[in-house]
Structures are given as C-alpha cells and as structure tokens.
A protein has these predicted regions:
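Conserved glycine-rich cofactor-binding loop
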Residues: 20-21
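Short, small/polar-rich loop/turn modules that mediate ligand/substrate recognition or access, typified
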Residues: 94, 181, 186, 248-250
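Substrate-binding pocket helix/loop in short-chain dehydrogenase/reductase
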Residues: 104-105, 112-117, 218
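Active-site helix of classical SDR
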Residues: 128, 165, 173
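Short C-terminal tail/terminal secondary-structure segment
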Residues: 2-5, 154, 238, 249-264
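Residue(s) in the substrate-gating loop at a strand-loop-helix junction
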Residues: 149
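Alpha-helical segment proximal to the catalytic Tyr-Lys
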Residues: 133, 178-182, 246
Length: 264
C-alpha cells in the first residue's frame, strides 16, 4: 500500500542503489506502484534480486537488476550507464546502499573506516555524478534522494565510522542541491532512524546477540510502540522524487522517533 498517487512517477526511469532489500527494495516497489516506466535495482547478490524483479514486473513497471557493489567506483558508475543503455536516461536516483558494521573511535581500523566511506559516501557521490551528467546532457532535470541516517548528527559510540560517512552524505546532499538548483535537479535526503528491515535483524543478531522476539521487545520502548517501517520511508522517498514535492531541494528530513535537541 502507498498513500501516493498511482501516477506520481509516471514515465520516469528510477535507479535504486542497494535496491534488493530493506528500504531500497521498499522504494523500488513503491516507485513501481506509482507508475514508474522502469525501475532499476542494484545489489551484490542476484539470487536476492530474483523475487523482487518478478514483483516489480507484476506491478507493471519494466524491471532491471544490475549487479553492482557501490563500494567499487567502476561498478557504481556502471549502474548508471547500464540504466541509460537500457532505457535511454535516468530521471530519478535513490541511494540506499549502506554498510553498518560496528566500530568505535578507538577500535575502528583503517580498513573498516575506508569500507564505510566507500559504501556510504563515495559510492553515492559517483552515482550522483554519473546521473547528473546525464540529466545535464539532456537538459531534462531530475530528482535524487539519499537515504542517510539519524546517526549523521552524532550516532552511538559503536557507530563512529558509520556516523562519519553518513554525516558526509548529508553534507553532500546539500552541496549537490545547491550546485544544481539552477538545472532543475533536486537533491534531498532522509535521516532515517531505527527501522525494521532484514538487514537490521541480521545486525541485531550478529553484533548484539539478539534472539527471536527482539523486534517486539525493542518496539515497546519507543514512542510509537514499534520500529520504523520501510514502506513508510519509501512513501517519503517517492514523494521527494515526484513532482508532488514541488521545488523542495537541499532538505535533509529527520525520519525518526527522537527530536534532536529535545530534553526531558
């Protein structure tokens, strides 16, 4: 289900990096439901993408899976060039791929730091670069949404490299929006909070020893009584991609159950 119009993205070619699971997959489904002409999803594992591609096809869009690790610049750029090769253009981009391994200021290795920057910042940078070049070439404008994180503000102590990389992506979002505000290219971002995704389940079990039922237990301590839902985030992503969001650009919207600066 989506609260958006079924033609919100009519005729648009949408590229979703990290689009085979979690928030990325939800955004791909919502884009298809909202009339996108084509939805391209990227990921590292074709077997994970198979079912999603079938879903997208059933929703009436033309789906395409591009195998790509956004941490590798050549593969990140290739996801854009393959989209253009298949459909002639890229109108909308969602950068949803992310790495969330744990590391503090004291125990993060150079390799871990570089891995976070490569996936969470460098990959989106060069995807945006390639997409914006196509948009400028066609003088057609376009929209980009970067899936950032509430950790871009501070983050917990065990998320030092993650917070640093996401803080960089928030700044990049505003910088790109400012640079191309005169080209009808809008760039926005979402600082998403704790969300119930497949990846979060793996993270909780791998790093925190979580057991079955952890999701419900964690939700009881939150204002809404639950974690965020990927489908809700997808609605906001597609809204920001669509003409319905008007002239909005350079906005990084907090999508969380906490209020920055709130006390007591």
């Amino acid at each position: 289900m989506t609260v958006l119009s079924t033609n919100a993205l009519a005729g648009k070619v949408v590229l979703v990096s990290g689009g085979t699971q979690g928030v990325g997959a939800a955004a791909a489904r919502t884009a298809a439901r909202c009339g996108a002409e084509a939805v391209v999803v990227t990921g590292r594992r074709p077997e994970v993408a198979e079912g999603l591609v079938d879903e997208l096809d059933a929703l009436g869009t033309e789906p395409l899976f591009v195998r790509a690790d956004v941490a590798v610049v050549e593969q990140a750029v290739a996801s854009v060039t393959e989209t253009i090769s298949a459909f002639g253009r890229v109108d909308c981009v969602v950068n949803a791929a992310a790495l969330t391994d744990r590391g503090t200021l004291l125990d993060t290795t150079p390799e871990m730091f570089d891995a976070h920057v490569a996936t969470n910042l460098r990959g989106p940078f060069f995807i945006m670069q390639a997409a914006v070049r196509d948009m400028l070439r066609r003088e057609a404008g376009g929209t980009i949404v970067n899936v950032i994180s509430i950790s871009a503000y501070t983050g917990s102590a065990i998320l030092a490299p993650y917070a640093a990389s996401k803080g960089g992506l928030a700044s990049l979002t505003r910088n790109a929006a400012h640079a191309h505000r005169g080209d009808r290219i809008r760039v926005n971002g979402l600082n998403i909070g704790w969300t119930a995704t497949e990846g979060e389940d793996v993270t909780q079990r791998r790093f925190h020893g979580a057991q079955d039922g952890w999701l419900e237990e964690a939700g009881r301590d939150l204002p809404a009584g639950r974690l965020g839902d990927p489908g809700e985030i997808a609605d906001m992503i597609v809204y920001l991609l669509s003409d319905g969001s008007g002239v909005v650009t350079g906005s990084v919207i907090d999508w969380d159950q906490t209020v920055m600066g709130g006390q007591g």
